[in-house]
UniProtKB/Swiss-Prot annotation:
Belongs to the HAM1 NTPase family. Its EC number is 3.6.1.-. It comes from Halalkalibacterium halodurans (strain ATCC BAA-125 / DSM 18197 / FERM 7344 / JCM 9153 / C-125). The keyword Chaperone does not apply. This is Non-canonical purine NTP pyrophosphatase homolog. InterPro entries: ITPase-like_fam (IPR029001), RdgB/HAM1 (IPR002637). CDD domains: HAM1 (cd00515). GO terms for molecular function: nucleoside triphosphate diphosphatase activity. One of its GO terms (cellular component) is cytosol. Gene3D superfamilies: 3.90.950.10.
């Protein structure tokens, strides 16, 4: 049985990724305590996910490594906050979402388009790397930020006119799209080994 390491220290993200892979013939492992956090210096979500996976590969050379990076990109703000979604300023996700609302000001809804994006990178023990992406498009509301909802509390889905917080665990969110594609790649690889 192959060992699969989820390359994140974020418990919620680790649990979400694990749920998708638990039916596969792999032994899912969390990061070991001696593996340091990775500096996310990439210019894209794919680059950051790759950096995480490659960093863990140094400690787990025979494992399948799965890493993910995601965030919000607001068109009128030239893609901001993009790869810095969780770290463009100190504070909570709610405070960062409020800052996005502040930067958008009173722009009309036609100028408030945005996309949640996710990239999942899988590094296989044989050196193969596969990349999966997911996205949901929508608009940023006029606010206010719903307490405890972060960016999901200010994002309206294009096709549902529904706040993204309501689809956090739904099949159509950006992360689940990317993970489902990654599961397909994993199944494909497992059949060949």
């Amino acid at each position: 049985m192959h060992k699969l390491v989820i390359a994140t220290w974020n418990k919620e993200k680790r649990d979400e990724l694990s749920r998708y892979f638990q039916q596969m013939d792999v032994s899912i492992q969390s990061l070991r305590g001696d593996i340091p956090d990775v500096k996310e210096t990439g210019a894209t979500f794919i680059e950051n996910a790759r950096l995480k996976a490659e960093a863990v590969r140094q400690y787990e050379p025979t494992a399948i490594i799965v890493a993910e990076d995601s965030g919000l990109c607001v068109d009128a703000l030239d893609g901001f906050p993009n790869v810095r979604t969780a770290r463009f300023m100190e504070g909570t996700d709610d405070e960062r979402a409020a800052k996005v609302l502040q930067r958008l000001g009173d722009r009309p809804m036609s100028e408030r388009t945005a996309v949640f994006q996710s990239a999942v990178v899988i590094l296989f023990p044989d050196g193969l790397m596969r990349t999966a992406v997911g996205k949901i498009e929508g608009w940023i509301t006029y606010g206010p930020v719903k307490d405890g909802q972060g960016y999901g509390g200010i994002f309206i889905l294009c096709d549902e006119q529904l706040l993204a917080e309501n689809i956090q665990m739904a099949r159509c969110n950006h992360r689940s799209q990317a993970i489902r594609q990654a599961v397909y790649y994993m199944e494909e690889w497992l059949v060949t080994v």
